[in-house]
Structure formats: C-alpha cells, structure tokens
Amino acid sequence: MVQRIVLLMVVGVAFTHSIADAHYLWVKIDQGNGDHGTANIYFEHSAAAGDGHYLDPFLESKTTWIRTVAEIEPKRLSLVEKRAEPDKRWVETPLPAKNPRSVDSYWLFGVYQYGKTNVLLHYYARYLDVDSHEDLHELGRADQMALDMVPHDSGRKLELRVLWNGKPVPDSVVHVRGPKGYKHNFTTDKRGIVRLTIGEDGEYSFRTSFEEQKAGKHGEEQYESIRHTATLMMTLPLSE
C-alpha cells in the first residue's frame, strides 16, 4: 500500500512537471482576419488555441511589438483576450501593417515550482512574415528580445543562430517542427548555429531555451534559477 501511494505521488509530480514544461509562447498570423491580418498569441503545447489555463499569470506582463522594413523600431501593440467554445482562450491583436513584418512577443510568467526548486520563467515568441532573403536580413534579429533565434537562408538551406543578450549560445538544443510530421532536434555549434535543409514547403517552428543559475526574488517569491524559452515560426523556403 505504501509503495502504491509513493508511486502515485511520483506520477502526480511528473504529470505536474509535464504540464508546465509542455507549454510555450507562440505567435501565429491569421492573414484573413482584418485589413492586414491578426496576430494570435497562444500559451499552449503547440501553436493553436487551447484552454488557456496558464494565461492568468501573464495578464500584467505581456508585451508584443511589430517591426517592418519601413519601420524597423519595435512598435508596441494592444492585446485583447479572446474566447471561443468549447473552452478555447488566447490573446490577439490586429496588425497595423502588411508583410514583410516581424511580430515579437515577450511575457513574464513569474515563479513556478518544479519539485522543490522555484524557477523564474520568461517566454519569448516571434513570427517572421517575410518572403525574401533581403527582408529576412532586415527583420531577422529582434534586438529587444534577450533570447533570440536569428535565421539566415540560402535557397533551401537555413542557418539559425541562438543569441542570449546578443551573444551566441553554444550547445543549445533547438527543436524544429515542420510540415508532414517533420520533427528533428539540433544542437548549436560553438558559434551558436544550427544548419538544416528545408524539405517540404510550409510553416516551420523552432524552439530553444536558456538557463541562468541565478537566485533572486520576484515580488514576494524567491527563486533559485531563471529559465528563458523562445519560439520562432515562419514559412520556408522563402520565395525570393
């Protein structure tokens, strides 16, 4: 009986961890909604509307910007919470300019307890809505994002550099997902770069994280470390 209780406790803890670990911040653009499209922002396992269970801690901290080639400086956007049946909840913002553009979002979750360890969680998400190599070069880097993934294309070849405060991050795992079930994980080299060949045309997502072994206090809560997680989405290959 004791063994069974212990096992259930372990499973319960693992399940709690899996819920927290499996949620990430995502930006997607609905091109057909509004004059210039609408950015939908989700905090879910994947880039789609879910129950929005973990949205509440973000209510005072979420910030989203748009950058265009014509206006490269980030312009802050107003966000509106949306709900749909059954039990769908997300955040959206109408976009004031057409592509080429980058929609960049940063949200601070706060302190989350993993087992006995309190971790301060930061989330970053971007959608690069570009068609050409030149536009990608202009919009690829989001300077306001502490953790960023910067793509560089050459035909069907793609390099992605992971940056922390503008500096390359070696040995960082980058999770890549794409059309027709494409799924592969890469590790950055000493220059913070991963390289891949684009197979099927379509929308790709990239995800990485960075850990700071730094203790501190957020509000009234103490934490032992800081975790930053970033996602990037874009359609590949570029047409020009």
Q: Where do the PLM segments sit?
A:
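N-terminal soluble domains immediately following signal/targeting peptides that reside
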Residues: D21-E240
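Positively charged n-region of N-terminal signal peptides that target proteins for export
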Residues: M1-I5
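Bacterial N-terminal signal peptides
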Residues: V6-T16
